[in-house]
Every structure is written in structure tokens, then in C-alpha cells.
């Protein structure tokens, strides 16, 4: 019989090893870390990432993260570099090389080219005495660690490299004041792009807004709500100030023999929640979930300018 409990034991061993390695990295930030940060903060060129094997995949991810936060970056395959793509590297670039051993032969031609062309190199390696470390301008020495896999498959070393790359990226964009608005420019697609969409760009506005006045009759209120098909209407004064909201539930609670005497102001919920047009879609969704509401008005300078339904947000992938 298969001992399935062993699966969890192995999983815990791997995760425990990863946790321990990250703690070691946190306590042993590379001595050149501040130097590379100061350099990159004033850097105007491109950051070229390179590495082979698993280090190459980590390099690709770091390059993608740099680019998405406003630092032009791309991945250069070492083999392609040796067959003509070295011409993609200019004197204004920084080449960041990833190699656990620092003796990856496929990187040597790139090292030689950069050294001969006065192109700066940042080395991410475990071996401070390696060829790569000795011939680099910035040494990002990562802690020596044992892989979680019993056969030595890159696991922990890959995680450490990725984490250090993410740390560099995060420090740079925070120090530069890179905002979520900036991030949206470089990442308009997917869930991230949807979450970072400003409400003003997706709200219902103009004639799409269900509006009634304080003295609008119960019957007319029902007609307007049915026409706009949002399950609610906003209540406004003559200056377009928001004073209340009426939902389908409010209507049901007020249906009785005296409905012909009812006006919007007598059945509305006063002081409803509202948001600014400048907030992000994700913030709006979180508020609506927290308050258990399906519609929320958008108000700027005390004036109603729009409304958003929770389904509008969910349908565009906001989460």
C-alpha cells in the first residue's frame, strides 16, 4: 500500500528548506546591494538579464518584472549571444548574469565582450571566487545553500535568485515613487490591469445613472428603476448632491395601501456609501463586498457623476 503521508513529509521538507534559505538571505543581503541600487536609481540604460538552464528562467522572470515597473529590460540567451546577439548589448546597458557556480561556460563570451567594451556586469552567484564574480562590477553574492531535492535539482537556489531580483525591483520602484497608475501603463492586461483600472474609466455615467428627486413619487421611482435595470436609483436634490439610495429591497418593504402617498425621500436609505472616480476598480470591489452592496455611486466634489454595479467589475475580471 502506498504511504501517501510521505507526500506531505517531502512537501514540508521542501517548504521548510525554502523558508530557512530565505531567512538566511534576509540576514545576509549582498554587500554590493546598496551599490547596485544607487547605480540603478540614476541608470538610464537597459538591464539585460542572462543565464542558462534554471538560472535562465529566473533571469527571464526578473527581466519581465523590471520592465513592468518602468526599467527597460530583456533576457538574452547566452547561446544566441555567442552567435551574433552580443550586438544587442550597448555601452549604456548593464548586464546582470545569474549563475550558481559562477563558472557557467556559456556566459564566458558575454563576460569577455562586456569587459572589453567597458559594459558593466552585475553577477548573482554563490561563488565569490568564481570567474564571473571576479570579472563583474557588482557582486550580488547569494548564500550557499543545499537544494531541497535529494538529487540536487535547482530548487532553493532558484528561489533565492528570484527573491533577490524581486528585492532589487521593489526597492527601485518604491524609491522612484512608481505608483499603481504607472504600473497600469505597463501592465494594462489581465487581472492586474483590470484591478488597476480607474473607476472613472468604467463607471456608468450620464443618462445611464438612475436618478430621482426627493419628491419623486413612488410610482415614478419604480418606473425609473425598471428602465435603468440596475436594481436601484440614486436620490438627489436639485443641485445633484447625493442624499440617498433606493434599492429593490426598499421598494418591497414599502409596498402597502398608502404607496400613492410615498415619495423617494420617505423610502430611501440616507447617507449611502459612495466612492471617488479616482479610486481603482479593485478598491471599489473590496468596499462593495465588505458593505454587502451591489451598486455604489461615484461622487466628485459632492456631485453625482456615475454609478457602478458589482457585476460590471466582476465581468471585466476585477478580483
From Swiss-Prot:
The SIS domain, residue ranges: 36-178
CDD domains on file: CBS_pair_SIS_assoc, SIS_Kpsf
GO biological process: carbohydrate derivative metabolic process; carbohydrate metabolic process
Keywords, in A-Z order: ATP-binding, CBS domain, Nucleotide-binding, Repeat
Annotated Pfam families: CBS (PF00571), SIS (PF01380)
Record Gene3D superfamilies: CBS-domain, Glucose-6-phosphate isomerase like protein, domain 1
Keyword Nucleotidyltransferase annotated: no
Tagged with keyword ATP-binding: yes
Binding site for ATP: 51-56
Any one Gene Ontology molecular-function term assigned to this protein's record: ATP binding
Alphabetical list of InterPro entries matching this protein: CBS_dom, CBS_dom_sf, GutQ/KpsF_isomerases, KdsD/KpsF-type, SIS_dom, SIS_dom_sf, SIS_Kpsf
Span of domain CBS: 203-263, 268-319
Family: Belongs to the SIS family. GutQ/KpsF subfamily.
Protein name: Uncharacterized protein RP505
Amino acid at each position: 500500500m502506498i504511504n501517501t503521508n510521505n507526500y506531505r513529509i517531502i512537501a514540508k521538507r521542501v517548504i521548510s528548506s525554502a523558508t530557512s534559505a530565505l531567512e538566511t538571505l534576509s540576514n545576509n543581503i549582498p554587500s554590493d546591494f546598496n551599490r547596485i541600487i544607487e547605480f540603478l536609481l540614476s541608470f538610464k540604460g537597459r538591464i539585460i538579464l542572462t543565464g542558462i538552464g534554471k538560472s535562465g528562467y529566473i533571469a527571464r522572470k526578473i527581466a519581465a518584472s523590471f520592465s513592468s515597473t518602468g526599467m527597460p529590460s530583456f533576457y538574452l540567451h547566452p547561446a544566441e549571444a555567442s552567435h551574433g546577439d552580443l550586438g544587442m548589448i550597448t555601452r549604456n546597458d548593464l548586464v546582470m548574469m545569474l549563475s550558481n557556480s559562477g563558472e557557467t561556460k556559456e556566459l564566458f563570451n558575454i563576460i569577455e565582450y562586456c569587459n572589453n567594451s567597458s559594459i558593466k556586469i552585475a553577477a548573482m552567484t554563490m561563488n565569490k571566487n568564481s570567474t564571473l564574480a571576479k570579472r563583474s562590477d557588482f557582486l550580488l553574492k547569494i548564500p550557499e545553500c543545499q537544494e531541497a531535492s535529494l538529487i540536487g535539482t535547482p530548487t532553493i537556489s532558484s528561489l533565492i535568485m528570484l527573491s533577490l531580483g524581486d528585492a532589487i525591483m521593489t526597492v527601485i520602484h518604491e524609491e522612484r515613487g512608481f505608483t499603481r497608475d504607472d504600473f497600469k501603463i505597463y501592465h494594462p492586461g489581465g487581472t492586474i490591469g483590470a484591478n488597476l483600472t480607474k473607476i472613472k474609466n468604467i463607471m456608468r455615467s450620464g443618462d445611464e445613472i438612475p436618478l430621482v428627486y426627493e419628491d419623486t413619487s413612488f410610482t415614478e421611482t419604480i418606473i425609473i428603476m425598471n428602465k435603468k435595470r440596475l436594481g436601484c436609483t440614486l436620490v438627489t436634490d436639485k443641485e445633484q448632491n447625493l442624499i440617498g439610495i433606493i434599492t429593490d429591497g426598499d421598494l418591497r418593504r414599502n409596498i402597502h395601501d398608502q404607496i400613492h402617498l410615498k415619495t423617494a425621500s420617505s423610502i430611501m436609505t440616507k447617507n449611502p456609501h459612495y466612492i471617488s472616480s479616482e479610486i481603482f476598480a479593485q478598491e471599489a470591489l473590496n468596499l462593495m463586498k465588505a458593505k454587502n452592496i451591489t451598486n455604489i455611486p461615484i461622487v466628485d466634489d459632492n456631485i453625482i457623476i456615475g454609478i457602478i454595479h458589482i457585476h460590471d467589475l466582476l465581468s471585466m475580471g476585477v478580483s
